[in-house]
Amino acid sequence: MLIKAYAKINLSLDVIGKREDGYHLLKMIMQTIDLYDLLNITPIEKGIEIKCNKSYIPCDKRNLVYKAVELFASNYGIKSGVSIDIIKNIPVAAGLAGGSSDAAAVLKVMRDIYIPELEYKDLIKLGTSIGADVPYCMIGGTALCQGIGEKVTSISSFKNHILVLVKPFFGVSTAEVYKSLDISKIKIHPNTDILINAINSGSLLKVSKNMKNVLENVTLKKHPLLRKIKNELIDFGALGALMSGSGPSIFAFFDDMLKAQICYDKMKTKYKEVFITRTV
């Protein structure tokens, strides 16, 4: 069974508090984009076999796909195994939920194969224990995500909008970014209600002008190159640019494919991982 596991971007990301266990409380708008990994999933007699086209991707228990299979099997008493070939296209450590999306896709397939009667809310609860982005990745589309990310509410679709995405040569540790974040020093928070109204109106310009990610306070300060990338994208005619997740990927919306293509072509000469795609 060949399936797609889509990347996500954050149209907004706000940190509104911190739980006693150290997890940060979030309020964010997530959006699926047409950039995806391919997973070829085959049931086998026993065990978990994972292969990947990228040599730097671990194929053992460090991989969220492995964790997803192991967790599902142990929770529901599945004795047979699974073989998974991953064709990795989503950049890693990029703020695009590549690993979480792969894990979410595998959980959905495991459910369909072994326990199709399993309610989605139970599958989502299982996914939360793997990673905070996994519940959203199971649902996808345009959604308001709250709590640590596990409370997902679908909102009006914001699909088919053009964007250019740049992932610089380095990765970022999500844990380190949150560890460095001082909530008391966040001066301007995203206005989520205004952003949702902009999404409801279908206005790409209004959405672009109201995007905000408070984690930029940490990641852009540590990596000034990201601010340069944002400015470059705007100079090419983007309506707005933002860092996705904890970074370092930067995306920008365009209302004209020609402008986006020119931007893509120029950025591709400077940065290795550049994509031109759409929201889905």
From Swiss-Prot:
<feature type="binding site">
    <location>
        <begin position="91"/>
        <end position="101"/>
    </location>
    <ligand>
        <name>ATP</name>
    </ligand>
</feature>
<comment type="function">
    <text>Catalyzes the phosphorylation of the position 2 hydroxy group of 4-diphosphocytidyl-2C-methyl-D-erythritol.</text>
</comment>
<dbReference type="InterPro" id="IPR006204">
    <property type="entry name" value="GHMP_kinase_N_dom"/>
</dbReference>
<keyword id="KW-0808">Transferase</keyword>
<dbReference type="InterPro" id="IPR014721">
    <property type="entry name" value="Ribsml_uS5_D2-typ_fold_subgr"/>
</dbReference>
<feature type="active site">
    <location>
        <position position="8"/>
    </location>
</feature>
<keyword id="KW-0067">ATP-binding</keyword>
<dbReference type="Pfam" id="PF00288">
    <property type="entry name" value="GHMP_kinases_N"/>
</dbReference>
<dbReference type="GO" id="GO:0050515">
    <property type="term" value="F:4-(cytidine 5'-diphospho)-2-C-methyl-D-erythritol kinase activity"/>
</dbReference>
<dbReference type="InterPro" id="IPR004424">
    <property type="entry name" value="IspE"/>
</dbReference>
<dbReference type="GO" id="GO:0005524">
    <property type="term" value="F:ATP binding"/>
</dbReference>
<keyword id="KW-0414">Isoprene biosynthesis</keyword>
<dbReference type="GO" id="GO:0016114">
    <property type="term" value="P:terpenoid biosynthetic process"/>
</dbReference>
<keyword id="KW-0547">Nucleotide-binding</keyword>
<protein>
    <recommendedName>
        <fullName>4-diphosphocytidyl-2-C-methyl-D-erythritol kinase</fullName>
        <ecNumber>2.7.1.148</ecNumber>
    </recommendedName>
</protein>
<comment type="similarity">
    <text>Belongs to the GHMP kinase family. IspE subfamily.</text>
</comment>
<feature type="active site">
    <location>
        <position position="133"/>
    </location>
</feature>
<dbReference type="InterPro" id="IPR020568">
    <property type="entry name" value="Ribosomal_Su5_D2-typ_SF"/>
</dbReference>
<dbReference type="Pfam" id="PF08544">
    <property type="entry name" value="GHMP_kinases_C"/>
</dbReference>
<dbReference type="InterPro" id="IPR013750">
    <property type="entry name" value="GHMP_kinase_C_dom"/>
</dbReference>
<dbReference type="GO" id="GO:0019288">
    <property type="term" value="P:isopentenyl diphosphate biosynthetic process, methylerythritol 4-phosphate pathway"/>
</dbReference>
<keyword id="KW-0418">Kinase</keyword>
<dbReference type="InterPro" id="IPR036554">
    <property type="entry name" value="GHMP_kinase_C_sf"/>
</dbReference>
<comment type="pathway">
    <text>Isoprenoid biosynthesis; isopentenyl diphosphate biosynthesis via DXP pathway; isopentenyl diphosphate from 1-deoxy-D-xylulose 5-phosphate: step 3/6.</text>
</comment>
